[in-house]
Curated annotation (Swiss-Prot):
GO cellular component entries: nucleus
Gene encoding the protein: lin-31
Name of the featured protein: Protein lin-31
SMART domains: FH
Keyword Ligase: no
Amino acid sequence: MPRPGKDSYDEQKPPYSYIWLTYMAIQDSDDKMLPLTEIYKYIMDRFPFYRKNTQRWQNSLRHNLSFNDCFIKIPRRADRPGKGSYWAVHPNASGMFENGSCLRRRKRFRARGGQDDDDDDFHHPAPSKISRKNPLPLLPEPPITPPLLSSLFPNLPPSLPNFCLFPPGMDPTKSLLLNPLSLLLMPHFLKNSSNFESSTPHSETSEISGSGSSSSKTPTPEAGFNSSFSIESILSS
């Protein structure tokens, strides 16, 4: 079937997108700008296909016109009666319509440095790949080991990091994950470092490995802290 000529589409749908139809209507006008009603009239006068189902295609054209940056809206002057603003082609969008060819689909013009999108009858902005509801995953916190604890608090007694992280009876190959808030108590440990040092058994390593006697004494919280340690002392510090 031969392809219809430029002005002989009759009832067939012309191979132009709504963006190209709008461009042709504006460029054929004397002032290079038209109100929306005149754009509709131009299309219906030139292409009989658009004389039916006018509400459907006019809504689609208006949607594309509003969201495509290659067209700019110009307020109607006071000396020109009528309703609605005028539409014109953006000065920087002339490259989209080079050679006067409106048959080919070209990339959508973005006036503010955005990415180009393909021109379709309906244009919907692409959703953001990074959503506030789906933030980037947080990196896992590293386990706190005795060397790390000693480096953070160099004034701690030598036996305190091992005792805090590996209580008697616990497998020394498995490190504990301390709550960061628990490190706030370290200054209170330092106040009683002498009492804690004296109450910590020297055979601590043997107790951890399980080779020590069951009668070995395990240091208790009361032995490591004096009676002045309380919740009030934490809050007042």
